[in-house]
Design a protein with these regions (language model features):
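Periplasmic/extracellular, small/polar-rich flexible segments of pilin-like filament-forming proteins
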Residues: 2, 67-138
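Internal alpha-helical transmembrane segments of multi-pass membrane proteins, especially GPCRs
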Residues: 14, 19-23, 44
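Alpha-helical hydrophobic helix detector
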Residues: 21-38
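Conserved alpha-helical elements of the SDR catalytic core
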Residues: 35, 42, 62
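Membrane-proximal amphipathic alpha-helices
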Residues: 40, 44-55
Length: 138
């Protein structure tokens, strides 16, 4: 059986056309444009959850300090940034306390500043505040 060079490329030739590849690229681009902002909101929310957990833990530590010393003055936060494991700082934490009250405030930093909740705080009576909607932020 003699093969002709003209038939070599046509018999069993497969692959995608340029138009098909461009359609796939466009579909991926559209899906990315829709999904990425939603993903970013979940990332901000998870970082906010981490700092809220830190703030509640530090408030409990401040209460233990108060039960021993009968004052909040002199208590210091074990970590002044979140995440406490290191890495990029997402929140700066500040403790302000006197004899009978305290407030722990978390101020967003860097990319976290885009979070709708903004600054979060908790006090000795477990009153929580936020720059955004309280029910959404706490």
């Amino acid at each position: 059986m003699k093969m002709n060079r003209r038939n070599l490329g046509k018999a069993g030739a497969g692959g995608f056309t340029l138009i098909e590849l461009m359609i796939v690229v466009i579909v991926i681009g559209v899906l990315s444009a829709i999904a990425y902002p939603s993903y970013q909101q979940y990332v901000l929310k998870s970082r906010r959850g981490a700092v809220k957990a830190d703030m509640v833990e530090y408030a409990q530590r401040a209460e233990r300090f108060h039960s021993v010393n009968n004052t909040y003055a002199g208590y210091a936060l074990p970590f002044e940034v979140s995440p406490r494991e290191g890495g990029t700082v997402r929140y700066n934490l500040v403790f302000v306390g006197d004899g009978s009250s305290f407030t722990i405030t978390a101020t967003p930093d860097g990319q976290q500043a885009k979070d709708v909740c903004g600054e979060l705080s908790v006090d000795q009576a477990n009153r929580k505040t936020a720059d955004g909607e309280l029910s959404e932020c706490w």
